[in-house]
Amino acid sequence: LFMIGFTGTTVTKDLASFLTASKPGGVIFFRRNLESVQQIVDLTNGLQKLSPAQPLLIAIDQEGGRVSRLPAEFTIFPPCGQLGQCNSSELAYSAAATIAKELRAVGINMNMAPVLDVNSNPDNPVIGDRAFGAAPELVGEMGSATIGGLQDNMVIACGKHFPGHGDTATDSHRELPVVD
């Protein structure tokens, strides 16, 4: 099962040809793919039409805070670190449920969230407020509630970047972190 990213905001002939030939299991959207509610609906519908036998996984990084790919028409959520400071699994569930409902409304069925790293290294350039906090118990409770809020509303959750990325001092987008 492959999941691919692509450039552009529409299903072009080249993209359609590639998807038809390669038959990926899914696509992931980034900011470069998303302009408006209607454009996202048109894009997801167009992509799904290319995969009539097996619905595509259509994924996004919609964590809240600085990792939010949807345009401004959607609800803006705080980073997970702020939710963690509230220490309310009910709030985490509710936020995730709302995110899921908005994603489903435009045809997105998978969220590359939540971040399940424990923010144990203040020098980490990537995790920071993307984590629910520095206590494993808090991260577990809030992460579990977030997964429930997404999945109870028909959006697949994908926990990340474990194991231990929160304890590194390396940007994993630039080099491979090592956890001792």
Positions of predicted regions on the chain:
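Boundary/entry segment of secreted carbohydrate-active catalytic domains
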Residues: L1-V11, T146
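Short beta-strand/loop segments at the ligand-binding rim of alpha/beta enzyme cores
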Residues: F2, L57, M154
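Enzymes and membrane/adaptor proteins characterized by extended Gly/Ser/Thr/Asp/Glu-rich
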Residues: A21-V139, H161, G166-D180
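Metal-dependent enolase-superfamily TIM-barrel catalytic cores that perform enediolate-based chemistry
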Residues: E141-A145, G149-N153, G159
